[in-house]
């Protein structure tokens, strides 16, 4: 992990991974016109530590390709949590997993030493503070620094900036 507050990783640390797939997908698409290599993300998130659970939070649309994508995520070790894209009157669309990710992280925290959030969304800052202060967990974030909240980065124990070596994490 690369951060001003570099923390050591220990092989006995229990790790839970929570990936905001939409956040990472759109960051890679907008910054690099590429797709994310989720297998590489999983490898750096776990490191040499003990993986307890890894969740990928996805939004279902009507695209045929997404079923194959979701199966690929499962095949590399992610548990898929999905919800339908909400379409509101007037055409506005919303697919938001922030509360679901926060709830799952808080529920699993007593069984973890480290929570890894894969998202640069600043809305997770209160979650980070809660996990550190109340649950006693270290919190790491993996995201593209160019599209990440500086406030979120400031609060985490470790930040891995995918922009430092983007080719490793893109396909």
Which positions does each model-derived feature cover?
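Nuclease catalytic cores that cleave nucleic-acid phosphodiester bonds
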Residues: 62-171
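Domain-level signal for Mg2+-assisted phosphodiester chemistry and nucleotide/NA-binding surfaces
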Residues: 2-97, 137-138
């Amino acid at each position: 992990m690369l951060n001003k507050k570099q923390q050591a990783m220990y092989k006995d640390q229990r790790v839970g991974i929570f990936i905001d797939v939409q956040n990472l997908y759109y960051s890679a698409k907008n910054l690099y016109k590429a797709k994310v290599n989720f297998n590489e993300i999983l490898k750096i998130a776990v490191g040499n530590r003990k993986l307890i659970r890894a969740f990928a939070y996805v939004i279902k649309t009507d695209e045929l390709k997404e079923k194959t994508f979701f199966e690929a995520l499962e095949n590399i070790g992610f548990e898929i949590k999905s919800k339908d894209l909400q379409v509101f009157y007037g055409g506005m669309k919303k697919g938001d997993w922030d509360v679901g990710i926060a709830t799952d992280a808080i529920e699993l925290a007593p069984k973890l030493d480290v929570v890894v959030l894969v998202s640069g969304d600043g809305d997770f800052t209160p979650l980070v503070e809660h996990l550190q202060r109340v649950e006693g967990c270290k919190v790491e974030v993996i995201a593209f620094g160019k599209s990440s909240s500086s406030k979120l980065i400031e609060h985490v124990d470790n930040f891995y900036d995918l922009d430092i070596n983007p080719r490793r994490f893109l396909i």
